[in-house]
A protein has these predicted regions:
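Alpha-helical promoter-recognition and RNA polymerase-docking modules of transcription initiation factors
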Residues: 1-110
Length: 110
């Protein structure tokens, strides 16, 4: 997904809705079979959480570069998480990846 500005990102992301746990499991099964559409659907359902994370950051971090870092963190979290196990919640895994992204972005910018 391509964004022209941070406002464009917020606007496009606001149209996505969160999935239920059952829908996540169905997408996970489809992902296991190799479906990239299911992966994209999972990623899109968590973009509003990423947008909320970005909004809570200082002004110097609210730019498209940081959006890209956060999108990569979301993709990494989706790829590494086993939705079929109930060991931890995906939100916990995603928030961990986003905090790592904050640190990485700050280190690379200064």
């Amino acid at each position: 997904m391509i964004f022209i500005s941070i406002e464009d990102f917020y606007e496009k992301v606001s149209s996505f809705s969160k999935m239920s746990r059952q829908e996540e499991k169905e997408c996970a099964l489809q992902m296991k079979e190799g479906s990239t559409a299911a992966r994209e659907k999972l990623i899109q359902s968590y973009l509003p959480m990423v947008a909320a994370h970005i909004r809570r950051r200082p002004a110097y971090m609210q730019n498209l570069g940081f959006v890209l870092y956060c999108q990569q963190a979301l993709e990494k979290a989706v790829d590494s998480f086993n939705f079929l196990q109930d060991s931890e919640t995906f939100v916990h895994r995603l928030s961990w990846h986003l905090r790592q992204t904050d640190t990485k972005y700050i280190a690379n910018c200064r």
